[in-house]
Amino acid sequence: MSSNQQPVVVGKIGSTYGVKGWMKITAYTDSVEGIFDYSPWFLKEHGEWREVKVSQWRFHGKAVVAELEGVSNREQAQMLTNCEIGILAEQMPELPEDEFYWRDLIGCEVLNTKGYNLGKVDQILETGSNDVLMVKANAKDAFGKTERMIPYLPDQFVLEVKLSEKQIIVDWDPDF
């Protein structure tokens, strides 16, 4: 992995499972087992990414557990608890032209229908009912806002996504 590539986070290491170095895995993929479609993984430890390989995995109830190469006991596994699991962006499936990954929206300018710049997408929250764009307002926001939370509801609030221009057009009152 080159130094300018940042892995795409697809999960997180959970607590240990047993005494032989197995770990519970929290997957952010569509299906919990989908995280194992990607290899290698990169783990973020102490702010640094390092490559790891999954030796084996299995279902544990509705969840999954995994064993990583080089991790053979509970103590080693505990050191990895809460580490993010990343993959290289090029490992992800290519999408049709009119679709995108949430990560593609990070950094996009958000403009309302009147052309007011509401700020840039800082992150996206998954709330269960609908996802929410967290928009960091510009430093000199005329309405004194520092952040806006805009529900990602196409046709209702999110009218257009222009990825080539890194812009999202929304129907949103800048004072809200």
UniProtKB/Swiss-Prot annotation:
GO terms for molecular function: ribosome binding. It is found in: Cytoplasm. InterPro entries: PRC-brl_dom, PRC_barrel-like_sf, RimM, RimM_N, RimM_N_sf, Transl_B-barrel_sf. Residues 97-176 form the PRC barrel domain. Keywords: Chaperone, Cytoplasm, Ribosome biogenesis, rRNA processing. Its main location: cytoplasm. One of its GO terms (biological process) is rRNA processing. SUPFAM superfamilies: PRC-barrel domain, Translation proteins. The keyword Cell membrane does not apply. GO terms for cellular component: cytoplasm; ribosome. Gene3D superfamilies: PRC-barrel domain, RimM. It comes from the Bacteria. An accessory protein needed during the final step in the assembly of 30S ribosomal subunit, possibly for assembly of the head region. Essential for efficient processing of 16S rRNA. May be needed both before and after RbfA during the maturation of 16S rRNA. It has affinity for free ribosomal 30S subunits but not for 70S ribosomes. HAMAP family: Ribosome_mat_RimM. The PRC barrel domain binds ribosomal protein uS19. Binds ribosomal protein uS19. Belongs to the RimM family. This is Ribosome maturation factor RimM.
